[in-house]
Structure formats: structure tokens, C-alpha cells
């Protein structure tokens, strides 16, 4: 999970994520197929604020349509931003509250990439 501020438009950011995936050997042949790297744009802006982007294009759906149902997305998100909120339908919900409703079996933290100096 990466939280970032950017001046890139959502489409430009998505193209950049796809380019990074390709640099790491990802080939987009089969939807939901095996992949070497999977970078998703989950949300753009904070729900309920002027910076929020809701996009309903077949190639870019924001917020990510399945993020609210995936503990493997919400768990690391909550770890890096305990105050995070996400849009679920018309509601804006704390990630922590949504996470409590999901089965977290098999979800475990990855390596800690923070600098140790």
C-alpha cells in the first residue's frame, strides 16, 4: 500500500502504474491471470472532499470497485493510515470499520520497508 500526493491526473497515474508493471515483466493477456506485479489505483482523493475523483469508465473505475471487500487491500491501508476512509456505494466509511466486517484469514503483513537508520 502506497499513499501519495500527486499532480498527475488519475488516467496519467494509471498509465504510469501500468508502465511500472510492464518494466517488471507483467504482460496483460488474461484478465485476473497470473502476474509478476499488480499495482492498483484504489482511490484518488479523499471521499467527500473536492479532491475526490469518482470515475466510471470501463478502463478506470474509482474508487476501485472491489477494494472495500478485500481484507488484503484494507489491512495494509489501515496500517499506513489508521484514519483513512473509503467510499462504499454512497457512504463514506472508515477503513477500520469496513475491515472489521471482513474475514482476514490469511492476511499477514509484508516486510517492513521503512528505513532503519
PLM segments and residue spans:
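Flexible, gly/pro- and Lys/Arg-enriched active-site loops
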Residues: 8-117
Amino acid at each position: 500500500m502506497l499513499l501519495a500526493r500527486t499532480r498527475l491526473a488519475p488516467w496519467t497515474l494509471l498509465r504510469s502504474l501500468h508502465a511500472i508493471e510492464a518494466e517488471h515483466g507483467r504482460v496483460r493477456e488474461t484478465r485476473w491471470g497470473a502476474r509478476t506485479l499488480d499495482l492498483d489505483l484504489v482511490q484518488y482523493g479523499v471521499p467527500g472532499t473536492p479532491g475526490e475523483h469518482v470515475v466510471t469508465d470501463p478502463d478506470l473505475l474509482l474508487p476501485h470497485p472491489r477494494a472495500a471487500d478485500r481484507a488484503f487491500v484494507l489491512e495494509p491501508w489501515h496500517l499506513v493510515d489508521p484514519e483513512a476512509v473509503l467510499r462504499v456505494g454512497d457512504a463514506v466509511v472508515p477503513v477500520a470499520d469496513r475491515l472489521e466486517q471482513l474475514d482476514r484469514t490469511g492476511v499477514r503483513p509484508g516486510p517492513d520497508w521503512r528505513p532503519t537508520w
